[in-house]
From Swiss-Prot:
Catalyzes the formation of S-adenosylmethionine from methionine and ATP. It catalyses: L-methionine + ATP + H2O = S-adenosyl-L-methionine + phosphate + diphosphate. It comes from the Archaea. One of its GO terms (biological process) is S-adenosylmethionine biosynthetic process. The keyword Lyase does not apply. This is S-adenosylmethionine synthase. Its cofactor is Mg(2+). The keyword Disulfide bond does not apply. The gene is mat. Pathway: Amino-acid biosynthesis; S-adenosyl-L-methionine biosynthesis; S-adenosyl-L-methionine from L-methionine: step 1/1. Keywords: ATP-binding, Magnesium, Nucleotide-binding, One-carbon metabolism, Transferase. ATP binds at G141, Q142, G143, S144, V145, D146. InterPro entries: AdoMet_synthase_2_family, AdoMet_synthase_3, S-AdoMet_synthetase_arc. GO terms for molecular function: ATP binding; magnesium ion binding; methionine adenosyltransferase activity.
Length: 404
C-alpha cells in the first residue's frame, strides 16, 4: 500500500508572485545534444533487447560527454576545422550466458548505441555533416547476465527500486513557463525553419517575469550559409523576433512582452555558426546539466538535480519517478478543485516501485474549495498511476516521453 500524503501548499500561486525566472536550453545546445543522444541510445537498446530476448536488460547510458570542435564561420558560409567529439559511456548488458548449454548470446550494444547517436544527430542538427563534422566514440561498459535471470525478469511483475532517491513534478505550467517552452519549440520547428532557414538549433530562452511583464532573452545561433551579409544576419533575427512575438500572444494571458535576441552581438562578434550549434566552437556538453524532465529549468519551483535522459526505464528511480511526478501533477491539476499542484515521490532501495516510501501531493485549492474537497480525488489519481506504473515504462521504451 502506497504512503500517499495530501496537504495544502502554503504559498502564493506562481503566476501571482512578483518575480519568476524560467529557462529552456534548445535541442542544439551542447547539454541538450547530450541529453538527446543519451535518451536515444537508451530507447534503441530497449528495442534491441526486446527484439532479441523479449525483455529490457540492465543499462544506463546517461554518461554522454560532448567536447566542442573548432569551426571557421563566416557570412555566406564557413567550414569546420576540427570535428565535435561525442563520447558514449555508461553501462549495458552485452551478453547473455546460458549455463545449461554453456552458450553465450552476444548482443550488439556498441553498434546499436553508435547508430542511435548518429541518427539522433542527423535529426536534431540539420546542417551537420555526420561524416566530417562529428566523431562518435563508444566506450559503454559491458556486462553479462544469466539466461535464467532474463526469464525470471519476464515473470516478475513489479521491478524494485535501484536506489533510495526521489522525483518531483508540478502543474500546471505558469504563463512564463508556457511561453519559454513554446518559444523554443517554435524556433526549432520545421515550420519556422522552412520560412527562416538561417535559424540554428542552438537556442537558449531565458524568461523573466516581473509582475505582469515578461522579458525573453534569447540566444539564437544563425547558420552562416543562409546569411551572406550582416544585413541578412539581422534580417534572420528580425524575422525570428516577429514570429516569437506572434506565437507568444496565444499564451500571454494579459501580460506585457518584451523580446531580445542575441544581445551580445556587435560589429566584431555575432552568433554565427556553420552547423547551427555552439558545439562547433569549443562549447562542451554533458547529460543532466540542462532542462529537467518537464523540459524546463525552473528555479522558483522544486526541482530534482537528477539527470533523467539515458537512465534505464525499468527501475531507475531518477528516471521513472521524475516522469511519473509530472504526469500525476498534470492529472491532479486537471481537477476542478485544484489551482496548482506539486508532487514529490521518494523510493526506498529494493522495494517495489509501486510502493514509494512516500508520495507527497501538495495543492493550492481553487477559490471556493478546501483541502477536504481535493484529498480523495488527488489520492485516487496517484493510486491509479502507481498501479499502472509499467505503462509509463512502456511509453519511455517506445520513445513517447520527453525527458528534457
Amino acid at each position: 500500500m502506497a504512503n500517499i500524503v495530501v496537504k495544502k501548499l502554503e504559498r502564493t500561486p506562481i503566476d501571482e508572485t512578483p518575480v519568476e525566472i524560467v529557462e529552456r536550453k534548445g535541442i542544439g545546445h551542447p547539454d541538450s545534444i547530450c541529453d538527446g543522444i543519451a535518451e536515444s541510445v537508451s530507447v534503441a537498446l530497449c528495442k534491441m533487447y526486446k527484439e532479441k530476448l523479449g525483455v529490457v536488460l540492465h543499462h544506463n547510458t546517461d554518461q554522454v560527454e560532448l567536447v566542442g570542435g573548432y569551426a571557421y564561420p563566416k557570412l555566406g558560409g564557413g567550414c569546420m576545422i576540427n570535428p565535435i567529439y561525442v563520447l558514449l559511456s555508461g553501462r549495458a548488458t552485452a551478453e547473455v550466458l546460458d549455463k545449461e548449454t554453456g552458450k553465450i548470446v552476444k548482443l550488439p550494444v556498441n553498434t546499436t548505441a553508435v547508430n542511435a547517436a548518429r541518427e539522433y544527430l542527423k535529426k536534431a542538427l540539420r546542417n551537420i555533416d555526420l561524416e566530417k563534422d562529428v566523431v562518435v566514440d563508444c566506450r559503454i561498459g559491458q556486462g553479462s547476465v544469466d539466461l535464467v535471470e532474463v526469464f525470471d525478469r519476464k515473470r516478475s511483475e513489479i521491478p524494485h527500486a535501484n536506489d533510495t532517491s526521489f522525483g518531483v513534478g508540478h502543474a500546471p505550467l505558469s504563463t512564463t513557463e508556457k511561453i519559454v517552452l513554446e518559444t523554443e519549440k517554435l524556433l526549432n520547428s520545421a515550420e519556422l525553419k522552412a520560412i527562416v532557414p538561417g535559424v540554428g538549433e542552438d537556442i537558449k530562452v531565458m524568461g523573466l517575469r516581473e509582475g505582469k511583464k515578461i522579458t525573453l532573452t534569447i540566444a539564437m545561433a544563425v547558420v552562416d550559409k543562409y546569411a551572406d551579409s550582416l544585413e541578412e544576419y539581422e534580417k534572420v533575427k528580425e524575422m525570428a523576433h516577429k514570429k516569437v512575438v506572434e506565437n507568444a500572444q496565444k499564451y500571454l494571458n494579459g501580460h506585457e512582452l518584451e523580446v531580445f535576441i542575441n544581445t551580445a552581438d556587435d560589429e566584431e562578434c555575432i552568433f554565427l555558426t556553420v552547423t547551427g550549434t555552439s558545439a562547433e566552437m569549443g562549447d562542451d556538453g554533458s547529460v543532466g546539466r540542462g532542462n529537467r524532465a518537464n523540459g524546463l529549468i525552473t528555479p522558483f519551483r522544486p526541482m530534482s538535480m537528477e539527470a533523467t535522459s539515458g537512465k534505464n526505464p525499468i527501475n531507475h528511480i531518477g528516471k521513472i519517478y521524475n516522469i511519473l511526478s509530472n504526469i500525476i501533477a498534470s492529472d491532479v491539476a486537471e481537477l476542478e478543485e485544484v489551482k496548482e499542484c506539486q508532487i514529490r515521490i521518494l523510493s526506498q532501495i529494493g522495494k517495489p516501485i509501486t510502493e514509494p516510501k512516500i508520495l507527497s501531493i501538495e495543492v493550492i485549492p481553487e477559490n471556493g474549495f478546501t483541502l477536504d474537497d481535493v484529498t480523495k480525488k488527488a489520492t485516487e489519481v496517484a493510486e491509479k498511476w502507481l498501479d499502472n506504473i509499467q505503462n509509463v515504462t512502456e511509453k519511455i521504451v517506445e520513445g513517447k516521453v520527453t525527458t528534457f
